[in-house]
Amino acid sequence: LNSKLNMRYAWKYTSKRNKLKNTFDEYFKHVGLPFLKILEEMGVKKNFRKIKNDYDRGSIRNINSITSFPNVLKTISNLKEQNKKLAIFTSKDEKRTKIFLKKFNLRFDHIECGKKTIKGKPFPDQINKILNKLKCSKKQAVYVGDMYHDYLSAKNAKIDFIFAKYGYGGLRILEIKKFINKFEELA
């Protein structure tokens, strides 16, 4: 899903309510990390819970700013017809993730969201949890992502990575050998 505009609205709302000086561009540099880690990286020192709640509220209020990349539903359907197991691994919280997926009628075999109880990106813990839940070996798995933290998560979990060029990251890392220009290239 393309949620950059939604993130911009949510950050503007949050910044105003909490008198934060950090720009959206500063925030966006860290997207992919768990939200509280982003705040730490930006030097925010207090009111984490209030800031997180305000961000979630601003994001949900602007849900209509989220769009789907072209051919996502069709591609997911094609992959399911090929008996591929599909999971979402996001740093977004579970509540917002489910709202966003419901809006676009997207269904996955597993949804793994940011949690306090397990290390998030770039650690491999959540990927390993997904593989365990889906009974999938590392050799069978591939992580498709568009941010540097996605790449690091896959590398740390020792699974293949495909960089989604159409996303946010604009990565130019020599180690990345596989990439797609459009989501439908997966099917």
Language-model-derived ranges and their functions:
Residues 60-88, 94-102, 124:
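Short, acidic loop-to-helix structural element flanking the phosphoryl-transfer center
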Residues 5-6, 37, 74, 95, ...:
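Active-site phosphate/pyrophosphate-handling residues
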Residues 30, 89-91, 144:
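Structural motif
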Residues 24, 63-64, 85-86, 115-116, ...:
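A generic structural signal for short
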